[in-house]
Amino acid sequence: MAVSGFTLGTCILLLHISYVANYPNGKVTQSCHGMIPEHGHSPQSVPVHDIYVSQMTFRPGDQIEVTLSGHPFKGFLLEARNAEDLNGPPIGSFTLIDSEVSQLLTCEDIQGSAVSHRSASKKTEIKVYWNAPSSAPNHTQFLVTVVEKYKIYWVKIPGPIISQPNAFPFTTPKATVVPLPTLPPVSHLTKPFSASDCGNKKFCIRSPLNCDPEKEASCVFLSFTRDDQSVMVEMSGPSKGYLSFALSHDQWMGDDDAYLCIHEDQTVYIQPSHLTGRSHPVMDSRDTLEDMAWRLADGVMQCSFRRNITLPGVKNRFDLNTSYYIFLADGAANDGRIYKHSQQPLITYEKYDVTDSPKNIGGSHSVLLLKVHGALMFVAWMTTVSIGVLVARFFKPVWSKAFLLGEAAWFQVHRMLMFTTTVLTCIAFVMPFIYRGGWSRHAGYHPYLGCIVMTLAVLQPLLAVFRPPLHDPRRQMFNWTHWSMGTAARIIAVAAMFLGMDLPGLNLPDSWKTYAMTGFVAWHVGTEVVLEVHAYRLSRKVEILDDDRIQILQSFTAVETEGHAFKKAVLAIYVCGNVTFLIIFLSAINHL
């Protein structure tokens, strides 16, 4: 999809990469077989948790209480296996004792064959019942994986072996129970990455475009260098948390090959993962990566690794000699957890083959539909509606005798500006729905305020069609209703713009956006105050003294023509300032 989203970034940075942080709700069925959380760390070797059972012998149909206890932990996965084949499927099923802290999982198509945590809250003890099946083996052993936090976990802690009556004694050594995975070696880089070969030897993506990773700590840099049948990947950027890139068949999240570099405890962990939808990424084995290295210096994090172009038989790793959209993102991380990014990731405008001829490319942090949506809303609710309101409220006497297409000039200008506002709002309103394919559930109050603004923007011209004649008794009610709805729409629109500027899909630079929008509001309110004061001062010149009381005439008189030049000057200055604010915002959107 050429203009659809940058939602993968929404994904890349919702992640929590610890076993528990990735799956705080305990839905870890993908780990049922190996019982290994793929964190990129080695598991602990000395268990500090124990499993106890209520009896050591059992018959099919028995229910045995199983207790897991020890140091505080956040996550766990408990299973029963055939003690003579610990790599086989789970045996039997479990019954919960406290469903508030634990839940049943379906592993190997056996319902309730495993138990896991329900949340990431700390626990010191878990109790469940194990139900012995009719086909139970002679010897059954309980195994548990326990996660204390991201880099501290234990895999397949062996529990008691329970046996059926008259079974031969079980003699398999416990040492075979816990296979500890090993990690590929990681070395240290000695100098910053260079962008001098970008477009010549390296395929480079940078944010901002053409930034220098050797000189700019804020430069997010990604390069691919082909070397025969492998590709060397370099990635660098701010060391505040993590860097990531992903290869995607489209600009939507799901079925994507992602790679992460996470800064934790003065170390950088390099981790491949894959994305299966709008959910947390699934961490994969690092066995597919070679020559891994990293460096932390001067506020910059660097990581590099080598990967074969093709990996036959390896799931979730894409062949690199195919064209993909490339996502590049960075964000905060703490204790191994990656937090949602404050800005959409950069996504290339089109698909690229990183093994093809070297290129030096950029991308955009916002999808075209959302950029157009924001631009049209700024034009409508910063400029056209604001000028239209001023013209109707303060310039009737100025252009009362000037006519345009058979109507008073002020009225025609007001009507054209308000009609333009309604049309722009209608066009902009549908764009997020087209982009999201429906309602946006992650945009806070912004879409709700937008719907209110859209409704009022459509009702205003419909109401104007039924405007009563000038001297009709209902005219005053119309005027108040028209003014109230218009004022409400403008206030809500400003609130929606404030909120919309912070949404990931159109996240304008933090350093100035709030000040600029506040400046626009102050500019408009200040102009209205100046014109109100000016109108009041003119009205004082036509006061009528009646029984020692001053009555202010509500209609303008010929005396007010003295201020026409002043009003026109104020309007000209206001329009220049308004357009300046508009250009600032439109320029910022264009550079996303």
From Swiss-Prot:
Chain positions recorded as heme b 2 binding sites: 414, 482
Residue intervals of the Reelin domain: 13-179
Known glycosylation sites: 138, 308, 321
Membrane-topology annotation of the record: Multi-pass membrane protein
Cofactor(s) required for function per UniProt: heme b
This protein's record includes keyword Ion transport: no
Occurrences of domain DOMON (ranges): 216-331
Cellular component GO terms, alphabetical: membrane
Residues noted as binding heme b 1 in the record, renumbered to the chain: 373, 446
GO MF entries: metal ion binding; oxidoreductase activity, acting on metal ions
Signal peptide extent: none
Enzyme Commission code(s) on record: 1.-.-.-
GO biological process: intracellular iron ion homeostasis
Disulfide pattern: none
Primary localization: membrane
Alphabetical list of InterPro entries matching this protein: Cyt_b561/ferric_Rdtase_TM (IPR006593), DOMON_domain (IPR005018), Ferric-chelate_Red/DefProt (IPR051237), Reeler_dom (IPR002861), Reeler_sf (IPR042307)
Subcellular location: Membrane
Domain Cytochrome b561: 335-534
Residue ranges of the TM segments: 2-22, 372-392, 415-435, 446-466, 491-511, 515-535, 569-589
Free-text cofactor note: Binds 2 heme b groups non-covalently.
The keyword DNA-binding appears for this protein: no
Pfam families xref list: DOMON (PF03351), Reeler (PF02014)
Protein's job: Ferric-chelate reductases reduce Fe(3+) to Fe(2+) before its transport from the endosome to the cytoplasm.
Family of this protein: Belongs to the FRRS1 family.
PANTHER family: CYTOCHROME B561/FERRIC REDUCTASE TRANSMEMBRANE, FERRIC-CHELATE REDUCTASE 1
Name of the protein in question: Ferric-chelate reductase 1
Protein source organism: Homo sapiens (Human)
Encoding gene (name): FRRS1
